[in-house]
Amino acid sequence: MQSEQVFDSIKARLLNDDNLADQYRALFTLKAIGQKGDRRAIEAIYEAIQKSSSALLKHELAYVLGQINDSYALPHLNTILADESQDVMVRHEAAESLGAISNLDSLDILKKYSADQSLDVSIRETCDISIKKIEFDHRPGKDTDNDNEENQIPVIDPAPATKSSDSNAKDVKNLRDIYLNDGLPLFERYRAMFGLRNIVLNSTSSQDIHTEALNAIADGFTDKSALFRHEVAYVFGQIDSPAAIPCLLKVLYDENEHEMVRHEAAETLGGLGADSKTAKDALIDFANNQSAPKVIRDSCIVALDMLAYEQSGQFQYADGIEKA
């Protein structure tokens, strides 16, 4: 457990609205602290949600509460989801985090907001996905049915990846068919999306299979659901492939695209920009463009800080303890 002095220093950085990029670094330091069971991190993150004026930061704060995966955060997430003054992105992330923690007690509030037709569709869709994830996680016989595969990256996905057998062309086609079928529940399509992601990340996949799966994921940018499209951009960040840069730039520059999707594309480009001067230049342009939506400008500021970290050789992005 961190000393009170060190912890207070990290918390102060998180609450300092003068430097958004530094707030992100402090947040991910607190995430690591919270994942070790120190609940002071949860309280500090919730305090930041109450005090921050940045929808981008607040949505990331809500996301981290879910990734810490401690039921202690549930009352805070319930409050955020119910708060009509919060941005849609923030409430959506609170709903997703309830699914990440996956407590059966969360089903009632998720069902309430899933059925509320007055809410933005992204919130309702997220609630529905989280309901299905919790029910899936608590299904009878889950320990023996072998219905999902172990995650290849250290995150809690909104839906568990569909397991593929051999990472071959048939697997890619089957997953793609589910992934792009807008007549299916988003939960099942998300599962297919993460299954395709895992095929790309699988080191034993051939280059042809890798490319097929990557192209299949990119096809998701044509979907009618902004929530779905934003998850596509997020998954490209997990894949960390320079091949995704052209389609992400197209999304970022599309003024008709939902801000939720454009901001996710910007942050993903921050992780890929070291491989592309075009990507870096685009992020710089948007970060300095006062006519661009604030959430996109802020995303580009954070993305450029991530890019600077990638190019600096620093040991870790979450540097709060080092700076405390």
Which residues fall in each region the model found?
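Amphipathic alpha-helical scaffolding segments comprising HEAT/armadillo-like alpha-solenoid repeats
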Residues: M1-L15, Q35-Q50, D70-A82, N103-Q117, ...
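Structural detector for internal amphipathic alpha-helices that build alpha-solenoid repeat scaffolds
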Residues: M1-Q2, A21-K36, E47, L56-D70, ...
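Short inter-helical turns and helix N-cap capping residues of alpha-solenoid HEAT/ARM repeat scaffolds
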Residues: D18-N19, S53-S54, E84-D87, Q117-S122, ...
